[in-house]
Amino acid sequence: MSREKPSVLIFSEMFPKPKSSSSGVFIVERLKALGNLGLPFDFAPVSTFDSLPIRILKKLKGYSPSVPIESVQVNQKHYPVLNVSLGLRDRIGLIKQEPSSWMKYAQGMASAIEKNKNIEEYRLIHAHRVFPEGYAAMRLSQKYSIPYIVTAHGGEIHSLSYDFHTLVREILRNASRAIFVSNALMKDACEKLGYDKSNGIVIPNGVDTNVFKPMDKEEARRKLSLPLDKKIVGFVGNLIEVKGADRLPAIARELLKLRSDVFFFIVGDGPLLKTLREKMPGDISHFAGRLEYGLMPMAMNSIDVLVVPSRNEGFPATILEARACGAWVIGTEAGGVAEAIDSDGIGGIVGEDIEKSLSEAINSSLEKGLHLASSTRRSKIPSWEDTIEEEAKVYWGCME
């Protein structure tokens, strides 16, 4: 087979954007590792950009408007972003989670890819997310008789509207293989959607341990203007309820009952920002907003503990990033949180008073002064190379 001609067409709406360089970075990291492995592929980043009315509406709802981007760079190559044109009503419909608007978006993805790519050149289509990307992949597969696979990342399974249950089950069943980033997510698909997992496989996210690695904690804190004499609890993610951001004030209050030397470093943006600023107790927190992805290794090195109070998750890459930098991780039972934490923290925390339980676990880890920078522990953390080696096996199996 010619190495110059791509065999696999990979596409997704998730990729780094100007105001959110961490968004979809797990897709780009996969592509980098795939390129290093030598398997020929093409990438189609797809998106719909915000008009002026949509930018205003997003700001009113506490969301950051998107900024148009022309291409996504992977290694030394630039892949043009394919724009899905939607009317104002449907753009508002996406924000309001209206099923008809999301179906138009999914159909628009298929049309944009078909218009800009010679589909018949490929031997396999890989959609990252079961919906809406997976629906576009299924349509293209049926039209061109090319197999497709999907990767379920989380939200399209655990937070899926009931209106899409039948459709998403169909997308999963018709795929040559359905990849899930955690065992918990595949179990959720089985229980929630009636998926039979006959074509399912679990391949977790990885982390670049050459980038996320231990560095001097004091230096990291100085550069980020964080206190040197405190135990720092980090939160990284969108400031929304599904990520458990609303639980942070109660966690902080409970933790202050146990110790006075704590400080919260909150990285992320979202509709709960104003509320969190008002409710976090005292002067014990710093809201960093969205950090450039290049600063994330420093951020992870600045903290003692990462707290993951999520209500739903797939397989949080932030947990692996924190572990690779030597931080302890405390999290709920949501999705693949416990799988991602492994033995480098405490996962699976449940209970009616979840905030108190999380604060007690945080305090316990701080009391022990745990730091996980040893090479033995870091060697157990999955890398992107590990992830892609498994995905490549799936590719070849589907193209035989």
For each feature predicted by the language model, list its residue ranges.
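Conserved donor-binding/catalytic core segment of Leloir-type glycosyltransferases
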Residues: 9, 227-243, 249-252
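Aromatic "clamp/platform" in nucleotide-sugar-dependent glycosyltransferases that forms part
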Residues: 311
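Carbohydrate-associated surface elements
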Residues: 184, 206
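Conserved acidic donor-binding segment of nucleotide-sugar-dependent glycosyltransferases
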Residues: 343-355, 364-369
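Short alpha-helical donor nucleotide-sugar binding micro-motif in glycosyltransferases
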Residues: 290, 298-303
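A charged, aromatic-enriched C-terminal amphipathic alpha-helix characteristic of glycosyltransferases
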Residues: 370-399
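Short hydrophobic beta-strand element within catalytic cores of glycosyltransferases
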Residues: 328-331
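Nucleotide-activated donor-binding/catalytic signature segment of Leloir-type glycosyltransferases, i.e.
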Residues: 274-291
